[in-house]
Amino acid sequence: MLQPRYGIWVPVYGNCGAMNHPAEPRDASYQRAKRLIQLAEDCGFTTTLIAQHLINPRNQELDQLETWTTAAALAEASDRIEIIAAIKPLLFHPVVLAKMALNIDAISQGRFSINLVSAWFKPEIEKSGINFLPHDERYQYSEEWIRLVKALWRGERVNVTGKYFQVQDLQLTPGSIAQPHPLVYLGGESDPARALAAQEADVFFLNGRPIDVIRQTIREVRQIPRAPHPHPLRFAMSAFVVARSTDAEAQEEFQALSQLAGHDDRSELMKGVDSEVVMFKNLAKYPAVGSNGGTAAGLVGSYDTVARRIAEFVDAGVDTFMLQFQPFTTEMQRFSAEVMPRVQALTLVA
């Protein structure tokens, strides 16, 4: 069994769990993000995800880091970790974005990737005066967008007359250090999201879900016809970890976090969600601490329990775990010291 890769969500909107945790700031800051990434490298994490929002979706009065300038700065401030920047195609013309990505690819010496997100938080789009396309059309837009971006990354001289974009005789240099181009991650729970991932993505991002749901999802996505591609589609999963010496201690901490998170005002977030987004339709089915599934993945328990569950996900086809913690620093260090070695032992035996 292959060893999994571990990553962290950069807390670009403050924190990843309860908004009012006494040990963590509510507002985001670049200096904190930089410290966490550098510590993550030292702890053995090999990738990181920087979500993209113009305004803080949890509370629009709180600070929100800008994704792409943060990605460029973190690329310079780090040595080994993969930098994944989320991108909502509605916010950037593909030519401009392709050029920006190539520059961060150069800064990072080939450690840069993108996470394609077709947008779900309406206020940041509509307040900017941008047309918030219907759900399925956003994926059509994203498909044309990413195909144009990838052609430019490959160094092609591009002539495109599409539904959304017209580009004439354009080639970008210098080309990509990452070959054939920076990796494309893509997540979503709708049929259009799955179809686009099968056609254009290198890695499909899964929201944290119970193991049986993840197994079924991977089986279904693997059945979707894939465009000609040098590699099969890989799978990554988000999760929020609560690990302690015993299952009882972990459950006690989880209940404390759940109680804190229960006091969060989510009305602003939910009012801004596109009602057609499947992920949010599933929230009631999979209640959790953390975003994008969080603790619904079941990584709550003793160090041995969490390690066994990670090994089960690896066996199901997940090779990358994008993790959230709270408090972030201490829990990330705990995971590195206690859980990573146990997973390694289990996967080596398997």
Which residues are covered by each model-predicted region?
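N-terminal beta1-alpha1-beta2 module of alpha/beta enzyme domains
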Residues: M1-A77, T161, Q179-P182, K281
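Active-site mouth loops of central-metabolism enzymes
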Residues: C16-Q31, A86-V95, A178-E189, V241-R244, ...
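Alpha-helix-loop-beta-strand connector modules within alpha/beta enzyme cores
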Residues: E61-I84, Y141-W145, Q333-A350
